[in-house]
């Protein structure tokens, strides 16, 4: 249950245009880490917090604080979130919905310490792609495009992401996942 003090602070921020309380943002991140569910309400809260509290000092964040996927963005935390979503999708396509997915095992590490998680995730992904003869090539191409954005030859993975960058990671993950469902829905309508 939400604290009455937090609810009051959020309402004051909404009505006065003041910054949102950090506790709101931190509680959303804790919930996402606990259940690994990124839904519309949580993504909207992250976006609202970052727009109100962080973009005055980091105007470059505005490019990804949109409603939908920004495929042109080179912002590392956002691209890493997108990459994680594609790795998850490649695993689901190759293996089906298994009991333990990369999201279950690696979401927390990937969103906080990408340098530790992503090399392992990419090794696992090679295994997944080899099992998916139908769609593996497509995922490989999309993943390659994101690795290019990250300058994979140099130092693509930060050792740590700040709390704000973790929010950008989560938004990248959410936007990429929603784009997957949107494209599927659109192609189903055409058939």
Task: Label the model's feature ranges.
Residues 1-191:
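Intrinsic-disorder/low-complexity detector
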